[in-house]
């Protein structure tokens, strides 16, 4: 095709899903002239699978995005139809906020935000080829022949890269939700030397809410107490008129239908070659893997206020449509459910993420960044977190400034990216609280305290918001000092309260801080029993309560973090030749050469590397015996 010279930009972002919109907004807000390309303008920030945001670990990522100046938290706070805090009976490290989204409003508001952002141009086009000169990405060419030049390029192709939808015996080339696939770009990446692999994900059927018998299901309403993802949202704006979700179960009849049709299931017939997500298996996969289970939980989730489409959660399937109908009709409440959209599986290309730096810049092509599902992750939140980091670094690269990274002790986003670039992934990667060594430090409630300073330094947090943040920090400090000074005496009222929360009697007066450390004792109780007002903001009270109750555990984690920082400070020269290091185990040498860790701490996290290998590597570097990589 004949090409033509189009406009020039500082940063170009390819793909306007959850990664792409964060990347483009971050770049534009940092002052860079930014172009955002999407295959379809009607699918900006679209939710092709679950109409929700948040959940364990993921909810914390949304808070981190917000604390850094990203958009996802604000967008869901403006468009949710239900909000719930999960794991409220557990400790603060695993509490998680989850919102049910109006998926159409979510898309519309995000598109509106992008269209009204200075420095940002939104355009519909398919990126076919990168312009690369001397190992540096200079721009791209679209399917219409337009040549766009830029200082940095961010790729966020999602599941569109050579996407293939599969429903039973039917298979066809497609992106998510029957959008156009991206064919030429992944082919171009392979020609440029990138290693790609094939992953698979899936989505459940949607049914007509008018045809569900909700009397046979269990209602799951939202929370009455105000909850928010964005630190800028006000309690007074909390939605009272929320929509409920409903819970039901599969049964032995459902499982028998699935087992009788496994020969037609693409997952088991060999049609699907891509590796699927371990933590979001299809219903047919669950029935086979957990054959001893008589039933599996299903959530019926509304997709918005102005649609009757209901998402049948935890029922992902690629069975033939007729089998899907039989499966649905065997479930309590869905006996007469009308299918509106069948479930499907989608196969797509991903880049092997060990080919990336922690900035999400590719190692072999400068000024080229990748983010989101194309890096091997699953989930909107994981994508958005990566998109934000890639967008920040694309802007910094365009400004010739050093890159921005988050460490494992600073954010779940840091854990996610480090896992990807250090370990790679053999399946769609899902962020879990168990992946974070320092999860008591990386809580849902303190993302602003961890990251707002960084967002402000990057220019993504306004001066007004930064002042509010500083005021909150000061209020926490003042409340902490005040509660240490107040004394709780062993009065009858105090003893009665302690008995009500199943705590031992008080024998002598103690400080309010020591009193609060007792299990089930609350900050409000300290105020009531002391007769003192120590804080007025409930979020300030929450910070003081957590800091005191978990003081010992937090101190232990900070000791571990100090060790991490010492190892992170031991940098590995970029040009080291691992083949020149004597006594290094073959497996360690191969993995060091492939991943090329940036520090001893990162080298330690590579699977298959033992302490002896680390000791040899450390000694080699300290002795200054660095062998230069020979020019090939």
From Swiss-Prot:
Sequence positions that bind NAD(+): 276-290
Biased composition (Basic and acidic residues): 216-228
Main subcellular location: cytoplasm
Cofactor requirements of the protein: FAD
Entry annotated with the keyword tRNA processing: yes
Function: NAD-binding protein involved in the addition of a carboxymethylaminomethyl (cmnm) group at the wobble position (U34) of certain tRNAs, forming tRNA-cmnm(5)s(2)U34.
Protein name, UniProt field: tRNA uridine 5-carboxymethylaminomethyl modification enzyme MnmG
Species per Swiss-Prot/TrEMBL record: Lactobacillus johnsonii (strain CNCM I-12250 / La1 / NCC 533)
Lineage of source species: Bacteria, Bacillati, Bacillota, Bacilli, Lactobacillales
């Amino acid at each position: 095709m004949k090409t033509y010279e189009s406009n020039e930009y500082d940063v170009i972002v390819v793909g306007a899903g959850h990664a792409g919109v964060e990347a483009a907004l971050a770049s534009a807000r940092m002052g860079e002239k930014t172009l955002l390309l999407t295959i379809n303008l009607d699918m900006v920030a679209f939710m092709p699978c679950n109409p929700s945001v948040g959940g364990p670990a993921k909810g914390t990522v949304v808070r981190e995005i917000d604390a850094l100046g990203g958009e996802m938290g604000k967008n869901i706070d403006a468009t949710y139809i239900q909000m719930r805090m999960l794991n409220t009976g557990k400790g603060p490290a695993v509490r998680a906020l989850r919102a049910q989204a109006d998926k159409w409003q979510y898309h519309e508001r995000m598109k509106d935000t992008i269209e009204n952002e200075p420095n940002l141009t939104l355009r519909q086009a398919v990126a076919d080829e990168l312009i690369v000169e001397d190992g540096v990405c200079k721009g791209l060419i679209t399917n219409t022949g337009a040549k766009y030049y830029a200082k940095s390029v961010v790729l966020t192709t999602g599941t569109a890269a050579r996407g293939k939808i599969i429903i039973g015996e039917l298979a066809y080339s497609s992106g998510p939700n029957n959008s156009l696939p991206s064919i030429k770009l992944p082919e171009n990446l392979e020609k440029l030397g990138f290693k790609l692999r094939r992953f698979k994900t899936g989505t459940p059927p949607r049914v007509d809410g008018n045809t569900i018998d909700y009397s046979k299901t269990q209602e799951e309403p939202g929370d009455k107490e105000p909850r928010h993802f964005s630190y800028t949202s006000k309690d007074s704006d909390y939605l009272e008129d929320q929509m409920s979700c409903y819970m039901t179960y599969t049964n032995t009849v459902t499982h028998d239908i699935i087992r009788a049709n496994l020969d037609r299931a693409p997952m088991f017939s060999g049609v699907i070659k891509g590796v699927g997500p371990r933590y979001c298996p299809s219903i047919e996969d669950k029935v086979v893997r957990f054959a001893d289970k008589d039933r599996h939980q299903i959530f019926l989730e509304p997709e918005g206020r102005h649609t009757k489409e209901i998402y049948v959660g935890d029922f992902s399937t690629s069975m033939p449509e007729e089998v899907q109908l039989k499966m649905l009709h065997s479930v309590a409440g869905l006996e007469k459910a009308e299918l509106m959209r069948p479930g499907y599986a989608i196969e797509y290309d991903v880049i092997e993420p060990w080919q990336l730096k922690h900035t999400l810049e590719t190692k072999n092509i400068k000024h080229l960044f990748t983010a989101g599902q194309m890096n091997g992750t699953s989930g909107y939140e994981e994508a958005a977190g990566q998109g934000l980091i890639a967008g920040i670094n694309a802007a910094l690269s365009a400004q010739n400034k050093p890159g921005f990274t988050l460490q494992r002790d600073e954010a779940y986003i840091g854990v996610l990216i480090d896992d990807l670039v250090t370990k790679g992934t053999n399946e769609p990667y899902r962020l879990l609280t168990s992946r974070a060594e320092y999860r008591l430090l990386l809580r849902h409630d303190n993302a602003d305290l961890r990251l707002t300073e960084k967002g402000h330094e990057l220019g993504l947090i306004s001066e007004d918001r930064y002042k509010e943040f500083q005021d909150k920090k000061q209020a926490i400090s003042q409340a902490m000092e005040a509660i240490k000074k107040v004394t709780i005496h062993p009065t009858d009222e105090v003893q009665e309260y302690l008995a009500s929360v199943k705590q031992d009697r008080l024998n002598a007066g103690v400080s309010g801080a020591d009193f609060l450390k007792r299990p089930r004792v609350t900050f409000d109780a300290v105020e009531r029993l002391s007769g003192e007002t120590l804080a007025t903001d409930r979020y300030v009270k929450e910070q003081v309560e957590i800091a005191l109750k978990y003081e010992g555990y937090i101190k232990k984690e900070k000791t571990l973090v100090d060790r991490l920082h010492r190892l992170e400070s031991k940098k590995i020269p970029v040009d080291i030749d691992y083949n020149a290091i004597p006594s290094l185990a073959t497996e360690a040498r191969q993995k060091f050469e492939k991943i090329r860790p940036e520090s001893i701490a990162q080298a330690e996290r590579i699977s298959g590397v033992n302490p002896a290998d680390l000791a040899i590597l450390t000694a080699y570097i300290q002795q200054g015996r660095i062998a230069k990589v020979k020019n090939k």
